[in-house]
Amino acid sequence: MKILLSGAGGFVGRQAAMELAAAGHQVLTTDRSGAVDLPGDLSDEQFCRGLPDVDAVVHGAAVQYVSADLPLGARRAYFQRNNVEATRLLCRRYAGAPTHFIYIGTSMMYAQDGSMLYTVRSPMAGQGIYSRSKLAALRFVRQLPNPHATVLPCIIGGPGREGLFRPFVAMAKRGTVAYPGEGRNPISMVHVADVASLIRHVVASRAKGLFNAAAADALCIEQWIDLIQAQLGMRRVRRLRIPLAPVRGLSWLTGYRLLAREQLLMLARPHVLAIEESLALGWRPLYDSARIVRDTADFLHKPSHHPVDPGVRRQNT
């Protein structure tokens, strides 16, 4: 199968490219930068028009709060151009063609309302600029006459991931870990290899609908810290809980560079995904949450043991 993979220079994109190629597919990669087949900007109409005919599109390209080129101002326009307009143009390019369209979303698109479990039937709501842009993009995908599917990963871990894990590992090395909130709400996570595997299953079955990507279990932040402490071989790590209110204020002042608004909601409430629809495709997550935390902590503690292509920008989606 001939597949166009957007966002191929990113954390998930690199893994998905390897997974799909190993399954025997011809993978054409595209991104704004990095070692890809078709470098270009999907928000450029001319570039999108020139994209080749393919059997499937896996659309993983997106920007978020921690993107390297996030501007200090005009952020709404930035997310609109890179997430919404890019998706609109990509959908227009392949609308009506015999092309299966797979959109990579985020579990932040669910309305974080305190539910103990988020299923593919749970309501969605944009609760920050990022999730609003991803939902706006999803509307174009849902308007396609083509068969289409959406993969919704939760927090993604594994070698190469940084995000919230980097400060936790750095603080643990110093003997004290400070974290916002109580740290006792279960939060789903998923290994990047399992996300790529789910994408492969969706492509292979030409599946339609929504598919959550998460490990079979969920841990809380306190448990993450226990695992990081053990992985680093630390005898004692002090915990320091920070009330969420001042963290929310600081995040707002930094334009949610410190923590995304959606992440703040996740810290205050459970965020656990149901994966029945994904399991029905024959997909099985190979990594439990403890293994994901350990692998990510090990990468951050000993990065030389897990080389990352230096020509590729690290991303956090």
Indicate residue ranges for each PLM-predicted region:
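Conserved beta-loop-beta element that borders a ligand/cofactor-binding pocket
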Residues: 106, 138-159
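Glycine-rich NAD(P)-binding loop of the Rossmann-fold in SDR/ketoreductase-type enzymes
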Residues: 78-89, 128, 132-133, 190
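Conserved C-terminal active-site "lid" loop/helix of NAD(P)H-dependent oxidoreductases
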Residues: 192, 226, 250-285
